[in-house]
């Protein structure tokens, strides 16, 4: 949990499947490599590495449950039949003044808002037809499953005032530039 006087900031990246969260975060990670003000969190997931999926650490269900029980996660949640966790070490990064960036589920936004006084929620979105096309190109779901997934999507801005939305329907370069601009703004405010 974050101290009362935070030095860094937690940036929670959310958005629907197919919006391009990993693509934008990967590009930002490359652009910011070597800049110690920024730390991209590597998620821990109960799934083995597969081509075409995000780079993550894997734990089986039993080891994940044990790690959660031992308090080794800053946050953890369940989605799409898998369990996801963020390592507790991210709190040390924030305490040290870093802008910590993590891909999270909207289900944990209330926990993030409760635990981290210095935070930003970045919603990566795209038009529905763009999402459908991207999900279809992955080849992991049927047309019906994609339609059901898109029907479940809801808005992410709940009026709390900490949300920035980036529309990634077009060129990913423009979306990445907007994301980097936001991260640099946070870093300037954090250091000031």
Curated annotation (Swiss-Prot):
Catalytic activity: alpha-D-ribose 1,5-bisphosphate + ATP = 5-phospho-alpha-D-ribose 1-diphosphate + ADP
SMART domains: GuKc
EC number assigned by the record: 2.7.4.23
Source organism superkingdom: Bacteria
A Gene Ontology term for the protein's cellular component: cytosol
EC class (word): transferase
SUPFAM superfamilies: P-loop containing nucleoside triphosphate hydrolases
Family: Belongs to the ribose 1,5-bisphosphokinase family.
Role: Catalyzes the phosphorylation of ribose 1,5-bisphosphate to 5-phospho-D-ribosyl alpha-1-diphosphate (PRPP).
Protein name: Ribose 1,5-bisphosphate phosphokinase PhnN
Source organism (scientific name): Brucella abortus biovar 1 (strain 9-941)
The encoding gene: phnN
């Amino acid at each position: 949990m974050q101290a009362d006087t935070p030095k860094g900031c937690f940036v929670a990246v959310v958005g629907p499947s197919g919006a391009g969260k990993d693509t934008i975060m990967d590009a930002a990670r490359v652009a910011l490599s070597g800049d110690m003000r920024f730390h991209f969190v590597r998620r821990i997931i109960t799934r083995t590495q597969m081509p075409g999926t995000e780079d993550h650490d894997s734990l089986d269900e039993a080891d994940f449950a044990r790690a959660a029980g031992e308090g080794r996660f800053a946050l953890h949640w369940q989605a799409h039949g898998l369990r996801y966790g963020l390592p507790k070490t991210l709190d040390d990064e924030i305490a040290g003044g870093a802008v910590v960036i993590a891909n999270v589920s909207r289900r944990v936004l209330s926990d993030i808002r409760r635990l981290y006084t210095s935070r930003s929620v970045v919603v990566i979105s795209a038009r529905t037809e763009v999402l459908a096309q991207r999900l279809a190109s992955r080849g992991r779901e049927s047309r019906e499953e994609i339609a059901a997934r898109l029907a479940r999507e809801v808005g992410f801005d709940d009026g709390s005032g900490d949300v920035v939305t980036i529309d990634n329907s077009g060129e990913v370069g423009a979306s990445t530039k907007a994301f980097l601009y936001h991260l640099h703004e946070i870093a300037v405010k954090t250091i000031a």
